[in-house]
Amino acid sequence: MAASRWLRAVLLFLCASDLLLLPPPNAYAADTPGEATPPPRKKKDIRDYNDADMARLLEQWEKDDDIEEGDLPEHKRPSAPIDFSKLDPGKPESILKMTKKGKTLMMFVTVSGNPTEKETEEITSLWQGSLFNANYDVQRFIVGSDRAIFMLRDGSYAWEIKDFLVSQDRCAEVTLEGQMYPGKGGGSKEKNKTKPEKAKKKEGDPKPRASKEDNRAGSRREDL
């Protein structure tokens, strides 16, 4: 009995020593090139986050959360359904209004009278204020001494705003969707076109004078 106990103790000791001498499970995998397991990634302190980290974090949140359509970027928003029953085939602008609904749209506005950039700032600011009072959300950017950009968040109202702008005394021109609309203040070009016609009329003035001289010569002959 004592011998059997000693034999069991020796066997247990040998088994335990073999287990202790075995290498860890990942030891062989680490020795083979290209199959080494990467070390665990250390979490970055949020105080050290840069713009790229914040963008990735925001994308992760957007995937997990349901975002309302109004908060989505414009290119990710679904297009508004078009009611074809309200379209007027005789007015192409009505089709454009429907397709631009809920989309950002820009138009170029030219101020007449060769203004300075400061004058353009003041004049277009008055127009923007009038549109704001009429409940139109319009942003304005000066892009030249006589030119400004009017940007709308809802492009379906662009043609109504265009009609307002072209009726202003100092509006020379409005460019919208590649189409140029002359403004009330853009009449200087038409006046320049009419000047040569006036000059032609002046060139034709000598003709009636010649007829008067002929009449005088005829009256003298009658006297003789």
UniProtKB/Swiss-Prot annotation:
Glycosylation sites: 192
Subcellular location: Endoplasmic reticulum
Disulphide bonds in the chain: none
Chain location of the short sequence motif Prevents secretion from ER per the record: 221-224
Bias (Basic and acidic residues): 187-224
GO cellular component, one term: endoplasmic reticulum
Disruption phenotype annotation: Disruption of embryonic polarity and mesoderm differentiation, likely resulting from a primary defect in Wnt signaling.
Signal peptide location: 1-29
Any Gene Ontology biological process: positive regulation of Wnt signaling pathway
Annotated spans, Chaperone domain: 1-155
Principal localisation: endoplasmic reticulum
Protein family membership: Belongs to the MESD family.
Protein name from the UniProt record: LRP chaperone MESD
Taxonomic lineage of the native organism: Eukaryota, Metazoa, Chordata, Craniata, Vertebrata
